[in-house]
Swiss-Prot record:
GO biological process: protein catabolic process
One term of GO molecular function: leucyl-tRNA--protein transferase activity
Gene for this chain: aat
Reactions this protein catalyses: N-terminal L-lysyl-[protein] + L-leucyl-tRNA(Leu) = N-terminal L-leucyl-L-lysyl-[protein] + tRNA(Leu) + H(+); N-terminal L-arginyl-[protein] + L-leucyl-tRNA(Leu) = N-terminal L-leucyl-L-arginyl-[protein] + tRNA(Leu) + H(+); L-phenylalanyl-tRNA(Phe) + an N-terminal L-alpha-aminoacyl-[protein] = an N-terminal L-phenylalanyl-L-alpha-aminoacyl-[protein] + tRNA(Phe)
Tree of life domain: Bacteria
Enzyme class: transferase
Family under the similarity heading: Belongs to the L/F-transferase family.
Annotated protein name in UniProt: Leucyl/phenylalanyl-tRNA--protein transferase
Family matches, as SUPFAM superfamilies: Acyl-CoA N-acyltransferases (Nat)
GO cellular component, one term: cytoplasm
């Protein structure tokens, strides 16, 4: 039986989440509210909300947990070529927290294979925008010729980043944003990005699963640390690609 949380009820221990033999492995609790205070409590415990319109708020803590260690991020030759182009061409920008709500809306509208509708509801957008205003949620955005073409958003506490969703309106646009985030987190010495659940796309970029017990222990330590700065731009990509190449003469494609 999944417990129902009233406004003042704490989360149960994550070990009580439903197991793999159930139809909803990782489901921990349900509630009627998505208050910012509840959302903060969830992230500090390694719990996240995931539900659809018409459902109660469902809270999850899966075992195992998908994570991406910035030090293990895989840059393919084609992505490295793209990142070098981003570095050398002024038309490319990576902006941080420029249009947080816009990124969330774009993620909500992005088609997902095997999914109908979106879990990024108006209620979710309002709740995470509240975290953004308090400095605990961030967007990393890929811009080209003054137009936002991809990005991602997530939650940050201390030295922990919890990835939420990403989208791309152009090839590699979300990967550019992720690579820029990874480069910044490497620079700051962060050890882990929470990716919640396993996907082949994340695995191809270096993501892997770890036991929930290890994940929660890391979260407990990391969120207690002082927060990192969140001002950076595409120049951090040089750590992943080497120095930017000089611009090619007009009409020549590298």
């Amino acid at each position: 039986m999944v417990p129902w949380l009233g406004p003042d009820d704490p989360f149960p221990p994550v070990e009580r989440a439903l197991g793999p033999a159930t139809g909803a492995p990782g489901l921990l609790a349900a509630s009627a509210d998505l208050l910012p205070s509840r959302l903060i409590e969830a992230y500090l415990r390694g719990i996240f909300p995931w539900y659809s319109d018409g459902q109660p708020v469902l809270w999850w803590s899966p075992d195992p947990r998908m994570i991406l260690a910035p030090a293990e991020f895989k840059v393919s030759p084609s992505l490295r070529k793209t990142l070098r182009r981003v570095l050398r061409e002024p038309a490319w920008e990576v902006r941080v927290d420029h249009d947080f709500a816009g990124v969330m809306r774009a993620c909500a509208q992005a088609p997902r294979r095997g999914q109908r509708g979106t879990w990024i509801t108006a209620e979710i957008i309002d709740a995470y925008t509240s975290l953004y205003r308090s400095g605990n949620a961030h967007s990393i955005e890929t811009w080209h010729d003054g137009r936002r073409i991809g990005g991602l958003y997530g939650v940050a506490f201390g030295r922990m980043f919890f990835g939420e969703s990403m989208y791309a309106d152009a090839t590699d646009a979300s990967k550019i944003a992720l690579a820029t985030l990874v480069a910044h987190l490497r620079e700051q010495g962060l050890e882990m990005i929470d990716c919640q659940q396993n996907t082949s796309h994340l695995a191809s970029l270096g993501g892997r699963e770890i036991a929930r017990k290890a994940f929660v222990a890391h979260v407990r330590r990391a969120v207690a640390e002082p927060p990192i700065p969140w001002q950076f731009d595409k120049r951090v990509l040089a750590a992943l690609t080497g120095p930017a190449e000089p611009a090619a003469p007009s009409g020549i494609e590298r």
